[in-house]
Amino acid sequence: MKANKKQTVIIVTAYGEDNYFQKRYEDVVGIYTSVKNAIKGAKADGLTNSQIDYLNRINAFYMLDKALNEGRSGESAQVEYEEETDARRKPCTSSYMFQSYNLN
């Protein structure tokens, strides 16, 4: 799957470092710091009702743990996580992971 063919929404579960994520993912449709913000922002970004309904059902930590444990990627949860550290960022933990959802 080519990056320019997918539609991605990233939900940051702890810290909203918008600039970092926007630079890293060129195909990002929206970056939201919570599911509630994702639904509100998704409407503003023109996502379809079915995509918004999908976002509304997400339990971020459950989906993240399940997808990581199953080693899945693709339709339901394309999950990526950062283990990098720098002056601004703590090492990745369950409270600092984020999700990238392919909504196509």
Where are these regions (language model features)?
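Ordered hydrophobic segments in well-structured contexts
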Residues: 7-13, 27-33, 76-78, 95-100
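Short, mixed-charge low-complexity intrinsically disordered segments
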Residues: 44-104
